[in-house]
Amino acid sequence: NLRTQKGLTTSRSLGINATYDWQRVKFRSNIQYVGTDRLEDSRTTIDNFLRQDKSITQSTGRNRLKNDNLIANAFLEWKMDSVTTLIFRPQYRTAANDRRNGSFQQGWGNDVLLNEKESSGTNHNSSYNVTMMMQLSRKLSRMGRNIALKVDYGSNASSTDRKNLSTTHYFKNNTEKVQNQKIEDEIDGYNYRVQLVYVEPLPWLHFLQFRYSYQYRANNSDHFVYNWD
């Protein structure tokens, strides 16, 4: 058996940071990007010897894989007055990858070409995720009494698209077999949560906390399969 393989990979990245401080406002942000691209070629030869019969399978293939990832987030704090503070924290994530492959295979028996198979495929995936948090808090006394309203929100979606095509030709009986398939998957959803927190100070450095929370989630998914000759 003999297998040779060679490939080339390229990588790239980028990062940006920003910081601002004003009298009552603080702002922080960060953006990060990472991407890769790999190209790979392969060749395989398999020799099988059984009694007086000999069979050889030869195949060549090419694969390419690309990935892209991006993350961006920020932080904002605004001291509206001496006892009231607003905080906002958003984040965004996205990712995408593409895979492409193709191959050609021949089967030989006793130096006679028996079959040929040509196949190709693609696979694309993409997704994103968004989250946001906002909190408004207010101090009601110097002893630790305070109240806060916090809202969280999130949204996400992803999709997958796969396609596989193959054609096999059998020379002995001169027939052909075709197999084609496409698969699609889609998922999306969102959620949010609202919280109201009240803190009451007690003697001897103890605190009593009251919390009300409401949360909602919704998700949807679809799956499709297509086959044709």
Question: How would you describe each model-predicted region?
Answer:
Residues 1-102, 121-161, 197-219:
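Membrane-proximal, glycine/serine-rich, low-complexity loop/turn segments characteristic
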